[in-house]
Amino acid sequence: MAVPKKKTSKSRRNMRRSHLALGKVNVIVDSQTGEYKLPHHVSLIDGTYNNRQVVTKKIETEEEVA
């Protein structure tokens, strides 16, 4: 089993971990619904992208649900 020859210092350990920090999520306000969404993604609320309808929601009937 591999064992380190020298103890890793707190400074070196923390410098290694500095790349693991999470970054901010870039969100924008949708112009039609006013909800937050990711840029360059289809709106999950109404299925629009670039002010155009690209996804139509399937309306579930009571027979399909049961």
UniProtKB/Swiss-Prot annotation:
Similarity field: Belongs to the bacterial ribosomal protein bL32 family.
Protein name listed in UniProt: Large ribosomal subunit protein bL32
Recorded GO CC terms: large ribosomal subunit
Keywords: Ribonucleoprotein, Ribosomal protein
UniProt record, GO biological process: translation
Annotated gene: rpmF
Molecular function GO labels: structural constituent of ribosome
